[in-house]
């Protein structure tokens, strides 16, 4: 799925975006791409089983609740499952899900990511490999960065008003900070 610069996507309360494949949303500095709710909230983004890498650049995402729909239940507001992803200059705010971004069994790069106002964890990486660079986490209800079985490099992050831990690592994770 390719989304053009300046596109402003508004989702209804029970709506969500599922992409079986890669997601490319590359905006410009002056013409960002926006994913937001029509009213209070929407159920987020789920990218799965992509053969090609997803790219999100100059993107704003807001007002997500957890995705629960019948048999489909996800902990992340934005979830990448077996789908490599690069995020650059992405702002995510006002998320009411267990994880803002949940990356599972994927390679990733998060550069200049700003996450604000969450009720739980900001980034949750499960059995993945990647990097978090030049990013900021503000008003986080759980951990800013939570790693399980992951191999991650972390450089120049700022975490403020984090309720639990700035960085949490378990299940044989390897971190380079």
Name what the model sees in each region.
Residues 1-177:
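Beta-strand/loop edge motif enriched in small/polar residues
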């Amino acid at each position: 799925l390719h989304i053009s610069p300046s596109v402003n996507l508004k989702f209804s309360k029970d709506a969500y975006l599922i992409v079986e494949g890669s997601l490319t949303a590359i905006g410009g500095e002056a013409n960002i791409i926006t994913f937001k709710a029509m009213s209070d909230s929407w159920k987020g983004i789920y990218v799965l089983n992509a053969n090609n890498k997803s790219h999100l650049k100059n993107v704003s995402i807001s007002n997500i609740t957890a995705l629960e729909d019948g048999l489909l239940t996800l902990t992340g507001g934005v979830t990448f499952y077996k789908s490599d992803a690069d995020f650059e200059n992405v702002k995510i705010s006002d998320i009411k899900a267990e994880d803002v971004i949940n990356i599972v069994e994927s390679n990733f790069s998060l550069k200049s990511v700003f996450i604000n106002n969450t009720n739980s964890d900001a980034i949750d990486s499960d059995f993945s490999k990647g990097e978090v660079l030049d990013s900021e986490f503000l008003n986080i209800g759980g951990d800013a960065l939570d790693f399980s079985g992951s191999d991650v490099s972390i450089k120049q992050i700022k975490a403020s008003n984090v309720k639990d831990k700035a960085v949490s690592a378990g299940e044989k994770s390897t971190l380079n900070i």
